[in-house]
Amino acid sequence: NTRTRKNLVRFFSDELASSGSNSDAKPVESMESIRASYGLFQHQMKAVNDLENRFTENSRLLLHMPTGSGKTRTAMSFLARYLSKRQTVVIWLAHNEELCEQAYSEFSRAWQAQGNRTLTSQRYWGQHEAHYTSLSDGLLVAGIQKFFGRIRDDSQAIYQLGERASLIIMDEAHQAIAPTYQSVLELLTILNSKDSRLLGLSATPGRTWNNFDEDRKLSEFFDRQKVTLTVDGYDNPVDYLT
């Protein structure tokens, strides 16, 4: 009835008035910014997306990003995405121990932030001896000189590993056209011919800026397929970095 409605209106009006008059009440936070623990800049995210898209049609790609643009971080984000979608083996090759350790540590940070399961990461350079014959899901970071030596001593072990590896990453990709390194890369990619990808990382387009023959060899080795750094609003991405 009318009296009941009036009493209800009065009751709730009094409640609202009393709750709004509490000047000591602390404001309630309704939103917050959540920072990514392994975030990327826009140009790095674009490069990762480009790699994913281009690998659907190509088996070899060269990622060319100038020094200071986050080449390793970009490659690790791509690698984390790649491993998140499949159980497989990835081999990361570098020509010195410093680059190997950098890659190993960086992958650990990337996978802890972006990974979706527990997997294995193994060292194989210097004094490290990896048990990669049992590796079926994870990353092997290897010094290419040691890797090449193992091929000569125990080629069967390398064959078994190569058959399980679906992605080979070569840091400092301009080294890839050296005869020793090239033979290792060719062997690993041939062993898993049905599902094998090769990614080279480079801060410079070739061994030198003016050696056309070396640039041509590098381009041909990666099937003339290259992903480069692009930054909106800059014709030359180096200008963005300086």
Residue ranges and their predicted role:
Residues 1-29:
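N-terminal accessory nucleic-acid engagement/regulatory domains that precede
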Residues 19-64:
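Conserved pre-motif I regulatory segment
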Residues 69-77, 82-109:
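Conserved Walker A/P-loop ATP-binding site and its immediately adjacent core
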Residues 88-89, 135-139, 164-167, 194-199:
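Loop/turn-to-beta-strand initiation segments
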Residues 96, 142-146, 201-205:
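A short beta-strand-to-loop transition that corresponds to the Sensor-1 phosphate-sensing loop
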Residues 112-152:
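Inter-Walker segment of RecA-like/P-loop motor cores
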Residues 139-169, 176-184:
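Conserved RecA-like ASCE ATPase "motif II neighborhood" in helicase/translocase motors
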Residues 175-242:
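Post-DEXD/H (motif II) to motif III coupling segment of the RecA-like Helicase ATP-binding lobe
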